[in-house]
């Protein structure tokens, strides 16, 4: 690693730490020539994925679009930004592990739904309503029942009081 101060090519690693759950590594280095210290970061270079949309179009995988969809589903829910980062990392890791250059958008949606189902039922329903294109309240009711939701008995009001 080239020293940013003197340009020498020899530096020794003083300290290494994993960041983001092992997604990257921070290294403190010391230049052998000038003795100054500097920090470097290492991460695996992401593979370029193309997403195959339902209509057959192809577009590059956009982590920002994924993050925005999660943010909308989790809006005003008691979920930390770290959880959103965890889901994004899970999706990226699973897609990269496929070893293919193209993935169907439906696979991305199913991974997100699986993660949201474990995290927050309301966010799951919000995301599912868009992803699964609910046409009416009956679609919503079926999805909620699949989560274990049961409608409460109707409350009647005595109008004679």
Swiss-Prot record:
Cofactor note: Binds 1 zinc ion.
Domain of life: Bacteria
Keywords, sorted A to Z: ATP-binding, DNA-binding, Metal-binding, Nucleotide-binding, Repressor, Transcription, Transcription regulation, Zinc, Zinc-finger
Keyword Secreted: no
GO MF, one annotated term: DNA binding
Domain ATP-cone: 49-139
InterPro entries: ATP-cone_dom, NrdR-like_N, RNR_NrdR-like
Example of a GO biological process term: negative regulation of DNA-templated transcription
Zinc finger (unnamed): 3-34
Cofactor needs: Zn(2+)
Similarity comment: family membership: Belongs to the NrdR family.
Role of this protein: Negatively regulates transcription of bacterial ribonucleotide reductase nrd genes and operons by binding to NrdR-boxes.
Name of protein: Transcriptional repressor NrdR
């Amino acid at each position: 690693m080239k020293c940013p101060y003197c340009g020498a090519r020899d530096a020794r690693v003083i300290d290494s730490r994993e960041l983001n759950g092992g997604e990257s590594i921070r290294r403190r280095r010391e230049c052998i020539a000038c003795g100054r210290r500097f920090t470097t970061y290492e991460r695996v270079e992401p593979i370029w994925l193309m997403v195959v949309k339902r209509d057959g179009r192809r577009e590059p995988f956009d982590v920002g679009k994924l993050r925005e969809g999660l943010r909308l589903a989790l809006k005003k829910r008691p979920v930390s930004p770290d959880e959103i980062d965890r889901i994004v990392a899970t999706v990226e890791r699973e897609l990269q592990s496929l070893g293919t250059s193209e993935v169907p958008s439906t696979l991305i949606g199913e991974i997100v739904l699986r993660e949201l189902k474990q995290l927050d039922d309301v966010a799951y329903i919000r995301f599912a309503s868009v992803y699964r294109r609910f046409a009416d309240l009956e679609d919503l009711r079926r999805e909620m029942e699949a989560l274990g939701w049961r409608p409460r008995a109707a409350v009647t009001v005595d109008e004679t009081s």
